[in-house]
């Protein structure tokens, strides 16, 4: 297995003073980038996910267990949203299954951390990865104007990070300058799963180089300057993903849309994210990108 120091990170909702003043994601050195060693685990009902957690110490989630089955309710909630996200993406929307590691279970680790979520790539040949999320989503790092419920914050984080796992079924080792597309897609999907948490709007509102605060910005972020993050820009571009699904497709069913999946299919051929978006609009949806972008 080939290990590389590359990951996708996800911190949205932090105060804008911190959030937009620096890069939110850094490469993790190989010697410290190892899977957490936690004391307990739970396999989800449909046996697609293994949720790892501690029952004591700083990483332990709430151990509330209303149904008395010896599995903390928080852990069961993580498993439920993971399974629901997978069902929606794979069974309903037709995306490829996520690349898995040797045991066939996708691993999610519950930790006390400052990040909303991490999706960490293990193998750039197969695209296998794992996810780390927070154990309670409380504290200033998780303040959000648009998503107030801590359980909902967990749900959008799991949905977001799981879609990153699915994305690598199309391209196991995407170019880092395509981060805007990965994050645009995951922010869009999390909003489908928890539609009352429109947290991508915090980036539209507050990011100085979002497309609405800087209308001359290129749609793929290729003209970002030093200190400006392609991933941050991609969070704000979730609004463009919503625009594409709502304006270019006739379905009223959010999970019946196909345009984002088609972009991923085109992206899997090795073209740039920019070209995959343009090709999909012009070839599969018979429209002009210039018209679409101007209308947006």
Language-model regions, residue ranges each:
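Positively charged n-region of N-terminal signal peptides that target proteins for export
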Residues: 1-5
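Bacterial N-terminal signal peptides
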Residues: 7-17
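Post-HExxH zinc-binding segment in Zn-dependent metallohydrolases
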Residues: 111, 176-225
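Active-site rim elements
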Residues: 72-75, 219-231, 263-267, 278-281
